[in-house]
Amino acid sequence: MKCNQCEQTAANDSCTNIGVCGKTDNVSHLQDVLIYALRRLAHAALSARAKGIIVPEIDFFTVQALFITLTNVNFDPNVIERFIEQAIINRKTFAQLRGCKIDNSTRPIEEVKSMMSMPTGIDDFHKDKNNCSAMQMLLYGLKGTSAYAYHAAVLGKDDPNLYEFIYEGLAAGFPDREGNIDKERTLSDWMDLVLRCGKSNLRAMELLESGNVESFGVPTSTKVSLGQKKGKAILVSGHDLKDLYDLLCQTEGTGINIYTHGEMLPAHGYPKLHAFTHLVGHYGTAWQNQHKEISLFPGPVLFTTNCIQNPKEYIENVFTSGVTGWPGVQHCKDGDYSKLIERAKELPGFSEDVPGKELLTGFGKQSLLDAAPVILDSIKSGVLQHIFLVGGCDGAKPGRNYYSEFVEKAPDNTVVLTLGCGKFRFFDKDLGMIGSLPRLIDMGQCNDAYAALQVVTALAEILDCGVNDLPVSLVLSWYEQKAVSILLTLLAAGVKGIRLGPSLPSFVSEDILQLLVKEWGIAPITTPDKDIALLMQ
């Protein structure tokens, strides 16, 4: 085992015995084997595409398979083995469609066993540390992009060109069936692929936003209660709004109340979801606090995506859906939540109403574009001096209190936009108002970075200037691979001066880091006081 794809990797180097996330050496190895199988599949898919052969089901499978290798998504070795076997079957399907002769003497499961004996891991990328670093940036970016592409596809939104790039990225640096390999491309070539990944991720997030809006309505500013309501209860964590919608439909009229958790908070801002009266509030904070929070919740919990941690203390109350999995946890297939609902009826629920603070969410792209005249007038008049986007992933590693302190110390003449689970460091803070604008504006989930970028771009166009000329600064926290893909999107869009923390990715080589500093002005966070002063110059 040698895994360094997340921010909390051991000693800021790599996990070698067991993952900080909880994955075993066996699961880590299976994930490496799955990536290997997907790279082989990618070559077959590209060859088929060259002949005009596209199989949408295999495209969807590919992003689904990449998604399960993200941090804190799926820890079930049986599930990963089935994906490896299906990747082999899909590769042979492409070969047959191209008219190639297939050796069927080896069954897919036997090929899986053969792959299991192969050495895999980080050292397989490239012997040159810089090329190795760029290849890792590309792979982790592809994983994040695939997560968003998966969510978009579930809502009926996809783009053949997006899948084609994912195949191209997977195939890069890996030998095709004739043994040809393009690993020896230059670092500049690798970085070009990395930036193209950022552009592809922008497209994936665009598709997802379109799917969410068409399915659930345009997000609007909405009050959300942090209190509890007497009665049976189900907690929904993750990011998949369709899973939440399906559960709301199936629990309507049952007397069971639904609470959001983690990055499900912005769901309350979507009109079609908010219309369900038994979607009563939000419970808990970010993913790393789930052991304490879930153990106190008097009902079952549904994990629709990452981040799931070892639920051993309450495993009988945990259910998963979609790509998420943990050994021994009940999985809800095909949108059927009957067993989850049965468990909710068995558990006590909340015994009484508990009033809680109310906060605002649902400030999507359209809300801020509608407020653009107010924002621009405030900037021109000097009332609004600066806009900070403070968002990204939260985590357990020390140093993340920086973000709550940053927001608390942001001057009264500034506005803080936020998104992702990083907001839970300060989401319940009352920062007051600037005129008619709240000083703390929750734009949504991590994928709503697309909306934030569109808003900033629109402001720049109105002011006839570049994005980097605006009084806007990005202060980001990262943890897993979706954050990597978003960072690549920002780089591809030419956004400069990003502050990143709490630590820099261990897979980024010193030379590439210097390139990012030189070309994009990326810098590690220091202290809130120093960074605020510098960014407001």
Swiss-Prot record:
Molecular-function annotations in GO: 4 iron, 4 sulfur cluster binding; hydroxylamine reductase activity; metal ion binding; peroxidase activity
Keyword entries, A-Z: 4Fe-4S, Cytoplasm, Iron, Iron-sulfur, Metal-binding, Oxidoreductase
Pfam families from the UniProt entry: Prismane
Catalysed reactions, semicolon-separated: A + NH4(+) + H2O = hydroxylamine + AH2 + H(+)
Binding site for [4Fe-4S] cluster: 3, 6, 15, 21
Cofactor binding summary note: Binds 1 [4Fe-4S] cluster.
Major localisation: cytoplasm
Localization of this protein: Cytoplasm
Gene Ontology cellular component terms for the protein in this record: cytoplasm
EC identifiers of the protein: 1.7.99.1
Taxonomic superkingdom: Bacteria
InterPro entries on file: HCP/CODH, Hydroxylam_reduct, Prismane-like_a/b-sand, Prismane-like_sf, Prismane_a-bundle
Protein purpose: Catalyzes the reduction of hydroxylamine to form NH(3) and H(2)O.
HAMAP family: Hydroxylam_reduct
Family, per entry: Belongs to the HCP family.
PANTHER family in the record: HYDROXYLAMINE REDUCTASE
Protein name: Hydroxylamine reductase
Organism annotation: Lawsonia intracellularis (strain PHE/MN1-00)
Protein's gene: hcp
